[in-house]
Amino acid sequence: PFASLVDPDYAEFQTPGNMPKRIKEYCKKTGQKVPETKGEVVRCIAESLAFKYRQTVEGMEDVTGNKYNVVNIGGGIKDKMICQFTANATKRVVSTGPVEATSIGNVIVQAMAMGAIKDINEGRKVVRNSFDIKTYEPQDSEKWDAAYEKWKEIIKNA
């Protein structure tokens, strides 16, 4: 865990191309262990994305003054590792909604417009009662906190 970490927003990752090669080059450039196997590259990506999500949630909290206790994930919910890593990194419960959350949201808005659903709260209740909602609890917070500090240093110096 945490052997290789990247900044998902790094400029070299923004255009199509050989991403594993670019990740390896980034890790070499930043003095980290270079991931060699597909599994090491995938873990690097998953952990790094989870830290980026934490940075984003904390930034939203700073801007709004609100504290968010739950992270809701729509797309990407099929990747259980990303969901668990996000819970671990953010130190928040991750709640996953339906796979087709965008389409379902559209249906809810249309039902509201037609008067079949009173308001957004009722729409949320309909979704909760109609689809499996899985939650992921944070684990190993101290390890993830230490690795988050390491990640922030890596991306600052990249």
Predicted regions and their residues:
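Active-site core segments that coordinate phosphate-bearing ligands/cofactors
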Residues: P1-V70, K78-T102, I108-A158
